[in-house]
């Protein structure tokens, strides 16, 4: 972004990836952003195009269809999305969060079943944590999954679901033991195509937001939804809270990286504006206040 700055974590491979991502976004995403913001979500085939370009699940092992990269590869993608002003592509949830729950806790069968399709874009995923009455207090979730024979019966409601209108695979935080607190929480994967409509699963409205206009953020509802018991992540009930706590630090770091990239983008736009705009026949960059603030931001942007 800034000519004289070289990030300490970038290497030649990441620079090559950054250039490829930049070109892909400029060709396939940027021209459609205005329309996507009006319709409230990106086009479904944009996921398939990203998968074909190798931009989904870049830090998932190649044996499961992923890119075989690491967290740095995910960060390059996060940054380039911010630099290109792409606000609606929920790939951080899809690739950076849900895919890693499956890769970390899923059985070999679950990994082989879902991860390759997530990497190709055939599957779009979401994670359902937040509920209307509990916010981010995960121990207090009210959505239940009660074992009944070979299935779990899900009942409850989730909200603020990124990719909520598009996702066909959702990692749902549930109580398999409603009488317990943290130790009653489990993670269950819901394949929506088999339960939507008459199966008791439904999607609510696409929520209106102040920003992220092209990102579908939704409510979802479970009314006696039957999910095969084999869709439990980790094979043992009650492990969900520990799984969440193990993954949440990385999830928060993804958010932080995106925020830093957004700040960097705002700085660039501001610098360009200051250079170009005249203010009472005096350019803004001659203002002591503007110069001092810009210098402060540039010096501290990577701290």
Describe the predicted segments one by one.
Residues 52-122, 162-169:
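Internal helix-loop-helix
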Residues 91, 118, 133-136, 160-163, ...:
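Short Gly/Pro-enriched turn/cap motifs at secondary-structure boundaries
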Residues 143-145:
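A structural signal for short hydrophobic beta-strand segments in well-ordered beta-sheet cores
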Residues 5-13, 17, 201-283, 287:
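Glycine-rich beta->alpha junctions and the first turn(s) of the following alpha-helix
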Residues 284-303:
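Single conserved hydrophobic/aromatic residue that forms the stacking wall/gate
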Residues 151, 155-202:
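A short core secondary-structure module
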Residues 121-129:
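A short, Trp-centered hydrophobic/proline-enriched beta-strand micro-motif
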């Amino acid at each position: 972004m800034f000519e004289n700055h070289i990030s300490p974590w970038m290497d030649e491979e990441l620079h090559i990836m950054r250039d490829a991502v930049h070109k892909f976004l400029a060709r396939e995403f940027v021209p459609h952003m205005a329309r996507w913001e009006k319709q409230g979500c990106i086009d479904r085939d944009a996921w398939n195009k990203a998968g074909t370009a190798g931009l989904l699940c870049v830090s998932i092992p190649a044996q499961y269809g992923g890119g075989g990269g690491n967290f740095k590869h995910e960060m390059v993608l996060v940054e380039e999305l911010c630099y290109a002003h792409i606000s609606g592509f929920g790939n951080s949830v899809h690739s950076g969060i849900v895919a890693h729950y499956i890769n970390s806790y899923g059985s070999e069968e679950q990994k082989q079943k879902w991860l390759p399709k997530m990497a190709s874009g055939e599957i779009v995923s979401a994670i359902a944590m937040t509920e209307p009455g509990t916010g981010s207090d995960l121990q207090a979730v009210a959505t239940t999954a009660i074992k009944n024979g070979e299935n779990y019966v899900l009942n409850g409601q989730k909200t603020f679901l990124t990719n909520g209108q598009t996702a066909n695979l959702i990692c749902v935080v549930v109580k398999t033991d409603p009488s317990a607190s943290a130790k009653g929480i489990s993670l269950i994967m819901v394949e929506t195509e088999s339960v939507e409509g008459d199966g008791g699963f439904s999607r609510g409205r696409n929520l209106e937001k102040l920003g992220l206009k092209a990102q579908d953020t939704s409510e979802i509802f479970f009314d006696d939804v039957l999910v095969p018991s084999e869709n439990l992540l980790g094979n043992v009930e009650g492990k969900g809270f520990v799984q969440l706590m193990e993954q949440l630090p990385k999830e928060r770091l993804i958010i932080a990286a995106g925020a830093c990239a957004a700040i960097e983008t705002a700085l660039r736009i501001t610098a360009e504006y200051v250079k170009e705009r005249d203010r009472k026949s005096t350019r803004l960059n001659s203002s002591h206040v503007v110069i001092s603030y810009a210098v402060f931001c540039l010096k501290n942007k990577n701290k």
